[in-house]
Amino acid sequence: MRKVKPARKLGRTAAHRKATLSNLSTQLILHKRIETTEAKAKETRRVVEKIITKARKGTVHAQRIIFKDIRDKEAIKVLFEEIVAKIGTRNGGYTRVIKLAPRYGDAAKMAVIELVDYHEMPAEGQKPVKQDRSKRVKGSKKSEVAS
């Protein structure tokens, strides 16, 4: 009798799925925040949480085990020197998935996955500066009138 396994297939073969999650994990460690589909973000969260938990041990054995998943020396260096130092006292919950609006082209559910302690909020009272889009677009009526 077939039993359901608790992981998403992401519409890929096993090798392609493993490579995709490895690449997403590497980029999350290097950039601290990535935007992807909701399903990939949730699966990446599972992988990264386990990787960071292993990295907290700080042993050479842990580095070798993690290197099987990540395969990027720069990411391993950042993980063990920077991330573990900052997240060292936290007991799990190292990542956060924030849902976004659907993607324009195919309406896929999008999300941002980020490391929790690296989330940087803009300074209070400071609003983001909006660009005047009419100056940016070629041939717009506003830019012709202003000229």
From Swiss-Prot:
GO MF annotations in UniProt: structural constituent of ribosome
Basic and acidic residues bias (residue ranges): 124-134
UniProt-listed SUPFAM superfamilies: Prokaryotic ribosomal protein L17
Record-level GO BP terms: translation
Domain of life: Bacteria
InterPro entries the record matches: Ribosomal_bL17 (IPR000456), Ribosomal_bL17_CS (IPR047859), Ribosomal_bL17_sf (IPR036373)
GO cellular component: cytosolic large ribosomal subunit
Region (Disordered): 124-147
Residue intervals passing through the bilayer: none
UniProt keywords, alphabetically: Ribonucleoprotein, Ribosomal protein
Keyword hit for GTP-binding: no
Subunit organization: Part of the 50S ribosomal subunit. Contacts protein L32.
Family: Belongs to the bacterial ribosomal protein bL17 family.
Protein name, entry field: Large ribosomal subunit protein bL17
